[in-house]
Amino acid sequence: MNSIYRLSQLKQLEAESIHIFRDAISQFENPVLLYSIGKDSSVLVHLAKKAFYPGRLPFKLLHIDSTFKFREMIEFRDRFVQENDLDLIVHSNQEGISAGVNPFTYGSRKYTDIMKTQALIQALTAGKYDAVFGGARRDEEKSRAKERIFSFRDKFNQWDPKNQRPELWNIYNGRINPGESVRIFPLSNWTELDIWQYIRLEKIQVVDLYFARPRPIVERDGSLIMADDDRLPLKPGETPQMRTVRFRTLGCYPLTGAIESTARTVEEIVAEMLETRLSERSSRIIDHDGDASMEQKKREGYF
């Protein structure tokens, strides 16, 4: 009797992502993987290692350090890279650092442009990368929902959402002119729940900030901001209070809101995800900048 072999949903997503990695490597000469330290980046690196096992990754990791990441993120990054024998490039906008750019006095929009978008463009230009892997997913935000898996960028690293190439089935067009590049998103068809279920299945390590712990929190403009270091200026009457919270998404600590939660394990996070109705990026302050929307940021070069 013939048996029928079927892949589970997670294994289908895994196979698609591995195919995207291998297809991209066959088409591009100088790729790099943007490593943001979050859960999606951890899954992305895990999939890349599977795609090219038993060899080492055929590209380096690139981290854009805005200087305001959570301290736990930087500690995790350094340990993760060492334990997995990875080549990591860390880049910061030195002009922004010299000018003292920060999210408090410059505002989230200008700070993000200088310390993230401009820093990313600097690093990509210096490295002359023709392909950049990223962990963005279509379920995160509406501008990402309409973006291709192979997302074309012009010689200025800018994205034109009205000038996207058709993607038929699993056929990806990587043909570009000199100076142009492609952003590649192997996790495009994954959801936040898929990510956590895969983390559970594969026992992937992630930053502890994703799990509920007592943390020093200031409630500001409806967001729960963690006082991660003494650079956070407190307003009159503000005092950090210990509250049991976790983060669904990670970024710069002054611009990333926590959620109250009791989910202390991956299993409990999966159970929480089955009930939530809010987008994970609803707690990212930079996504609520009005005319500085995510789509506008992406047009200007943001990932």
Swiss-Prot record:
The keyword Transferase applies. Pathway: Sulfur metabolism; hydrogen sulfide biosynthesis; sulfite from sulfate: step 1/3. GO terms for molecular function: ATP binding; sulfate adenylyltransferase (ATP) activity. It catalyses: sulfate + ATP + H(+) = adenosine 5'-phosphosulfate + diphosphate. Its EC number is 2.7.7.4. It comes from the Bacteria. One of its GO terms (biological process) is sulfate assimilation. Keywords: ATP-binding, Nucleotide-binding, Nucleotidyltransferase, Transferase. Pfam families: PAPS_reduct (PF01507). Coiled coil: none annotated. InterPro entries: PAPS_reduct_dom, Rossmann-like_a/b/a_fold, SO4_adenylTrfase_ssu, Sulfate_adenylyltrnsfr_sub2. Heterodimer composed of CysD, the smaller subunit, and CysN. Belongs to the PAPS reductase family. CysD subfamily. With CysN forms the ATP sulfurylase (ATPS) that catalyzes the adenylation of sulfate producing adenosine 5'-phosphosulfate (APS) and diphosphate, the first enzymatic step in sulfur assimilation pathway. APS synthesis involves the formation of a high-energy phosphoric-sulfuric acid anhydride bond driven by GTP hydrolysis by CysN coupled to ATP hydrolysis by CysD. PANTHER family: SULFATE ADENYLYLTRANSFERASE SUBUNIT 2. This is Sulfate adenylyltransferase subunit 2.
